[in-house]
Amino acid sequence: MGKRVVYPGTFDPPHYGHLDIVKRSARIFDEVVVAVAKKPRKFLLFDAEERVKMFEKMVEDIPNVEVKMFDCLLVDFMKREGINVIVRGVRLFTDFEYELQIALTNYKLAGVETVFMMPSQEYIHISSTIVRDVASYCGDLDNMVHPYVKQKLREKFNCGS
């Protein structure tokens, strides 16, 4: 069995920065499981099923990537899936501080390792928050999200065609 890793997140919505991390992870590891957090206590623009569908559209041409939803502690999901490595994208130093705290907690809880990856330079400025903000004003999303995600955002914000 090859090395499987998990790339977890809320992905509300998924964007090209997320896809960049997945593509690069898929070149390094045998299998990448994109784990979409259901997060019922957090306000989300899209429900979990919609976010899974968007990510599936983004990775449909990458054979060693699958997208799953989870609604539990990440380490419990990982145990069920037989995965012991997490991949996380880190854009800024402030991201790293938070991610390091989570990585240390996951290690203490279940002995899982975390691999940090920087997004490629052309995607480092993109966040789901920025994508939602631009989309809410019907702005140009072409360089931020997959066409399917763009379509869903335009529908959500009544932007027309």
Swiss-Prot record:
The record marks 18 as: Transition state stabilizer. One of its GO terms (cellular component) is cytoplasm. Keywords: ATP-binding, Coenzyme A biosynthesis, Cytoplasm, Magnesium, Nucleotide-binding, Nucleotidyltransferase, Transferase. Pathway: Cofactor biosynthesis; coenzyme A biosynthesis; CoA from (R)-pantothenate: step 4/5. ATP binds at residues 10-11, 18, 89-91, 99, 123-129. Transmembrane segments: none annotated. Substrate binds at residues 10, 42, 74, 88. It is found in: Cytoplasm. InterPro entries: Cyt_trans-like, PPAT, Rossmann-like_a/b/a_fold. It holds the Pfam family CTP_transf_like. Its cofactor is Mg(2+). GO terms for molecular function: ATP binding; pantetheine-phosphate adenylyltransferase activity. Its EC number is 2.7.7.3. It catalyses: (R)-4'-phosphopantetheine + ATP + H(+) = 3'-dephospho-CoA + diphosphate. One of its GO terms (biological process) is coenzyme A biosynthetic process. Reversibly transfers an adenylyl group from ATP to 4'-phosphopantetheine, yielding dephospho-CoA (dPCoA) and pyrophosphate. Homohexamer. Belongs to the bacterial CoaD family. PANTHER family: PHOSPHOPANTETHEINE ADENYLYLTRANSFERASE. This is Phosphopantetheine adenylyltransferase. The lineage of its organism: Bacteria, Pseudomonadati, Aquificota, Aquificia, Aquificales. The gene is coaD.
